[in-house]
């Protein structure tokens, strides 16, 4: 397993809503950072992600402590190392009482949702609004895309800021 396994490509994007910034966080497993055009890639066409990166805020230097799917995702969502959350080895669940970004953003009025690959648990540690797990499906599943559009439209209509994590599975080697 290489250091590229868990996280190598992601874009952090923000918009203004109700005076608070919206957050869209795109991540993919087993994908090199320079695959996406926003980070210099030439082989894959990613015009919409490139625009999000240009117009928003992105991380150009970010690191994970473990290059495995579940430990990394739980580290990202909790801000704590896998040794603290108990998520080693891969496919492990966090220890009870682990707090995630959902616990911190919800009291601030944010809706916090997860679209795509989840690979985290238990649910009380990561109580995302689930928009659909595409880990065994094609990412462009029409039902999931409709659910995501409804989520975004609802946030806009109610002027709720949101934090949306999009976890692709398609890039797995």
Locate predicted features.
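Sec-dependent N-terminal signal peptides
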Residues: 5-14
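N-terminal secretory signal peptides that target proteins for export/translocation
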Residues: 1-2
